[in-house]
Amino acid sequence: MRRNLMFVLLGAAIGATSLHYAVKAWATPASGFTAITLAKGTVGAFEVFNHFIPPNVTDDDGEKKIWLSWQKTRGRSDLYVQSNTWQATQPGLPVASTGWHSHPGHSLIIVTAGTLTNYEGDDPTCTPHVYSAGMAFVDPGGGHAHIIRNEGSVVAQNIAVQLIPAGQPRRIDVSPAPGNCPF
């Protein structure tokens, strides 16, 4: 009886180890991509509302246009400033990418060099969203899976400002890949 229990436990350990490595194999790791944290700080809960009425700016009906911004958090948040770099695409090598991932909070992103292409995990047509130097975009976070690739022949870079719940991982690898894109 004791020997049978030992074999059952050994089999369970081997199975758990195999599953651990199989799950890692399904992950979509970054390739040709580096991320450097430039700054990190923690802030308590806050609510900020701003508005601005630009002078001499009206809509089609002659009404003044108003700019609005609202940010509200509950609980402490970590604020990151990240510098991200993608290597240039080289013939015969994989395209530099972040791998499929998500973030627990949103990111404000400015492309500072080259061109980046963002693909959304919930887009059945795998539509490329292309951003070149000087352009900005928002990643909504909250489990929103995406991959950012440098499909160009020059190095691409961006700066990302991320607001996430305090103490949580900044990046969450998505495994397996969503399956909506051919890569």
Language-model segments: what does each one mean?
Residues 4-7, 18-82, 129-130, 175-183:
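A short, N-terminal "cap"/entry segment at the start of jelly-roll beta-barrel domains
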Residues 74-77, 86-110:
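A short beta-loop-beta micro-motif enriched in histidine and acidic residues
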Residues 84-88, 93-96, 120, 124, ...:
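N-terminal post-signal-peptidase region of extra-cytosolic proteins
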Residues 96-103, 120, 129, 149-150:
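Short histidine-centered beta-strand/loop micro-motifs
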Residues 103-123, 135:
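Glycine- and acidic-residue-biased ligand/ion/polar-headgroup-sensing regions
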Residues 121-143:
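Short acidic-glycine-tyrosine-enriched beta hairpin
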Residues 132, 141-169:
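Ligand-binding loop in jelly-roll beta-barrel domains
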